[in-house]
Amino acid sequence: MEPLLQNISDTARWVAVFRAEESDRPDAVFHDPYARRLAGERGEQIADAIGFSRQNSWSFVARTFLFDNLVMQHVAEGYNTIINLAAGLDTRPYRMALPSALRWVEVDLPGILTYKEHIMAAEKPVCRLESIKLDLADRTQRLALFRQLGKETSKALIITEGLMIYLDALEAAELAENLSEQQSFRRWAFDLVSPALLAMSQKEMGPVLKEANIVFKFAPGEGEDFFRPYGWKPIVSYSKLKTAATLNRLSEEMKAFAAMPEPEGPVRPFPWTGACLFENMNSSQ
């Protein structure tokens, strides 16, 4: 029997399930009317197989909520380009109230973007959407793309939602350095986990992911400061647990954890995950 997860792109189907479930709630904090179609039956099966993620679906809800807010914040600040790396099945260019003049560039592997284009064929994005099919692991292609986009925009926000945990430290450092070389890439938002949460996630979800040769890797001990040598200054980080608590998405047990004081980062010797925003130190703001 084929494994449920066959490649890294299948994780996008898995995550889409949680966006669909949140969207179905009467008190939903965001609405993604396309998520269930995109997840498909396989997405549901994957989510069911990874019980730990089902029990902690609040983390995915909080992440989507936080990234939605970061996008809207930067649009309000006059950012004219959003570049979504490893975009997967993201539908923000269709579901959010974005300016029609906003340029939205999504980059991911050909397979997942072709699948999304097929499902979304009858839908119309609200902004200027460009889909670029490219393997971000290919350094030559990646650099060429970044240089091209860097010349074409003056004020871009980069988002890499759900990507960093799959990189190793060298890959994360190279990506950070490549991005910071483009002065017009003013800010970068991504989610990060602490070493303690990485170990927990590897234990609870690792066996299912391993079938598809997918491994959780990246959780720098120095937290956000890992990125300073590569041109990125931390601005703010939002705890997913604290966010989920304010959204009333936690179980009673998790509410007790959320009520505890959370020590300031960037070094966090406890299970933690959050959405982090960085400023390009090579940019003239």
Where are these regions (language model features)?
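A short, conserved alpha-helix within the catalytic core of class I
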Residues: R139-R142, Y166-Q182
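Short, glycine-/aromatic-enriched active-site segment of Class I SAM-dependent methyltransferases
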Residues: L198-I214
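Short alpha-helix
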Residues: I214-S239
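Rossmann-like AdoMet
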Residues: M1-I83, A87-I132, R139-T140, F146-Q148, ...
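C-terminal lobe and adjacent flexible extensions of AdoMet/dcAdoMet transferase-like proteins
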Residues: F270-Q285
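A short SAM/SAH-binding and catalytic strip from SAM-dependent methyltransferases
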Residues: K155-L170
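Conserved beta-strand signature within the Rossmann-like core of class I S-adenosyl-L-methionine
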Residues: L157, Q182-P195
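Conserved catalytic loop of SAM-dependent methyltransferase domains
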Residues: I235-A259
